[in-house]
């Protein structure tokens, strides 16, 4: 069996600190082992073949509806996180398949319009129920556990990708600001080093590509980059990326935690503050945020009043496992209706959300 040969190879080649595929804590619903893929390789494939993964190409990273083909979107961000985390994992002799699975799945629950969309959706959810929230890390886990459909080898469709514990935990803990999730420990860091690699790689990726895109958009110039960042990390973006990756590798070798040096940490914080001031808050993308709030708020309120308008979506949503008449059921259960509408809107691409608002407001456009 090819899988068993590969598992033996992992045991021989990977670090004692790596997470071996054969030692996975397994899946919520036990499955037969695949003859040629390890559990983590199988998870990579399940995520890449999912609809949620394909939709990432039409979701904003920072620049909403950018004029140009070379700006990052949520899919290219995901691929860059995967590339960085894989480089670090291989150098540290960690499990590259586990790293890759977490990386490709980490943003599956992201809303349209980037973090502006996430904030708008969170505010809208809280408007209806103050104790509810929308956070993309939790939604990413909800996507892989519940919302995404897959076809089993017997031809039957089921809800949820049924990923391994380690991949699910890595997805849930890839970002700061996470509420405790009942399935995982309350420690903010993933328990696997591979999960920690992805968490740090996510940060490295967005610092690198958000600056690159901001320079391309002429929002900032290379000369504007703070001196501390240049002195510590390098005088161009390519050099800075290499410095960060090498620093993670050097500082984390043979350690039970993935880390960076104090000097580099300070430089990264300075870089983030610079982007926040010049790009995230004080520039063109920020001006677009008001439009995002209007779009998300309009759609949310519209579907709270007209839940029957998404009847087709409801019949492909796991709510159908609870009731044969989801429209009537949700009209009686407002809390669940809020969650389902958040599921629906967060699954949208930027362009679909914009076109939807236009079609609702102007059903018969003047020709």
Describe each PLM feature range.
Residues 105-113, 205:
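Short active-site segment of divalent metal-dependent hydrolases/proteases
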Residues 114-127:
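A glycine- and small-aliphatic-rich helix-loop capping segment at beta-alpha/alpha-beta transitions
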Residues 1-78, 82-88, 95-96, 117, ...:
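Histidine-centered, transition-metal-coordinating active-site segments
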């Amino acid at each position: 069996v090819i899988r068993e040969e590969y598992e033996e190879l992992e045991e021989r080649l990977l670090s004692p600190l790596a997470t071996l595929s054969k030692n996975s804590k397994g899946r919520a619903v036990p499955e037969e082992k695949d003859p040629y893929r390890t559990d983590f390789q199988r998870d990579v494939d399940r995520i890449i073949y999912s609809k949620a993964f394909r939709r990432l190409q039409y979701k904003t990273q920072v620049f909403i509806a950018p004029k140009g083909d070379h700006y990052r979107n949520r899919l290219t961000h995901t691929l860059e996180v995967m590339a960085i985390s894989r480089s670090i994992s291989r150098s540290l002799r960690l499990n590259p398949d586990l790293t890759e699975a977490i990386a490709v799945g980490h943003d599956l629950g992201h809303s349209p319009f980037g973090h502006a969309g996430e904030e708008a959706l969170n505010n809208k959810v809280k408007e209806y129920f103050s104790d509810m929230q929308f956070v993309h890390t939790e939604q990413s886990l909800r996507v892989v556990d519940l919302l995404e459909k897959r076809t089993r080898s017997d031809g039957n469709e089921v809800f949820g990708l049924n990923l391994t514990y380690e991949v699910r935990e890595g997805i849930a803990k890839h970002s700061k600001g996470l509420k405790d999730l009942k399935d995982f420990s309350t420690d903010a860091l993933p328990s696997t080093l591979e999960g920690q690699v992805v968490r740090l790689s996510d940060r490295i990726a967005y610092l690198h590509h958000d600056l690159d895109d901001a320079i391309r958009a002429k929002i900032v110039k290379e000369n504007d980059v703070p001196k501390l960042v240049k002195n510590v990390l390098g005088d161009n973006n390519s050099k800075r990326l290499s410095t960060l990756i090498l620093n993670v590798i050097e500082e984390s070798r043979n350690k039970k935690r993935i880390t960076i040096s104090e000097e580099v940490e300070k430089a990264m914080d300075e870089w983030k503050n610079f982007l926040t001031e010049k790009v995230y808050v004080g520039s063109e993308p920020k001006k677009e945020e008001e439009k995002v709030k209007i779009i998300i708020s309009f759609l949310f309120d519209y579907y709270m009043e007209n839940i029957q308008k998404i009847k087709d979506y409801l019949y492909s949503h796991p709510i159908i496992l609870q009731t044969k008449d989801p429209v009537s059921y949700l009209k009686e259960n407002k809390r669940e209706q809020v969650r389902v509408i958040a599921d629906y809107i967060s699954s949208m691409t930027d362009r679909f959300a914009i076109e939807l608002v236009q079609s609702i407001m102007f059903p018969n456009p003047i020709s």
